[in-house]
Every structure is written in C-alpha cells, then in structure tokens.
Amino acid sequence: MNLRSSLACTSSDIARWGLRSVLKRQGGVLPGRIAMKIDRSVVITGTNGKTTTSNLIADAVAASGATVVCNRAGNNMEPGVVGALLEARSDLKHTDSGKRVGVFECDELYTVRVLPKLKPTYFVLLNLFRDQLDRYGEIDHTQEVIAHALELSPATTLIYNADDPLCASIAARVPNASIAFGIDGATNTESDRISDSRFCSQCNAPLEYDYVQYGQLGAYHCPSC
C-alpha cells in the first residue's frame, strides 16, 4: 500500500471512530467522502441493487463461503460505497485468501460515477418508477444516466427486469451483455392502470398489455415493431 492509500485509509478510520465513539453515529458516508478526496483508487467487483435485494444477494454469496463486502447500511452514493470498501479493509487482511465478492447498493444517478470505478461483474436493474421526480427529474434522464454508466463499464453484464419496459429499453440500447428476469404469468394481483411507460422505446407506438402486475410492470408487446 502506497503512502497516499495509507493516508486515505487512516483518515477514514479516524473519521469513522469519531462518528461512532463521539457523535454516536454510524459514519458510513463521511469516511468515504474523506477517503475519496485523498485516494480514489479503491476498486472492487460488485453487484448493484436496492437495499433488500443487495442484502439478500450478499447473504446468498456469504452462504457459499465467499468473503462479502457490502454497504448494508444503505449508504448508496459514491462516498458510501467507498466507505464500505474501507470498512472491509481490515477484515480482508485477516481472512484466508479465497473468493471475495463485492455487493453494493447504488443510487440510480450515482451509477455513472460508481460503475466505471468498480467495474462490477454484474449490474442488477430492478425497476424504474417516478417516485422521486423532485430529485431525479424526468424518468428519461434517469434512463440516460444508467445507460451511460453501462457504456462506461462495457465488461459488466446487465441483469434487468424484463417485465419493466423502462428497464428493457435500457438493455436494448447498451452494448453490454444482458440477462433478463421476470414473472412468467399473471399473479392475480393485476392492476388496471399503467403508470409510467405507455410507448415503445423503439418506434414510440403505444404498448399493448396482456396484463399489468404493478405500475408499468407486466406482459406487454409493441403492435408495430
């Protein structure tokens, strides 16, 4: 470890100790923010998802015997991811050499900052909804950011929810390898309202649905293309 990296880790450890011992706070974000200002070279393979999904994946990976690095507290912006990496630094030094896997939750708009640095093996895209328009703006902007993030990490495999046309449209426009998942059939909890995506991303024709599970998620097709 070079002097710059050592200084970053030491500063992060001091910040974490101060937040936990003096201010009685978890300190997941500030240590990462401090470390990033000093050393931006902390990179580890990871998989992105929301809090519940990332924790489930982390538990499954840990059950396989691998060592897992995960931002379980939900600090899902760039400083929080770096903080999780630094938190794991001392643990990794004392574990036997073997398979080590990073599983990180990431804020949608921070994917463009996190993916190019982590270069994760997989990127999991669960769904996209208009529930945070005050912060994210139009859903089109969020799609653009995620697509650009994947373009900046071309070796990353996209795992996406094919029941969501907003996710499927991202998969169709990026060069990354992709794996689709979804629900095969109705769940008897269908909705009669489509909330976010009514038009084909390729030709802009109105999408037709066999059924809608929730929001825009369901079995859909484009009658034109």
Predicted region positions:
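Cys/His-rich short segments
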Residues: 184-225
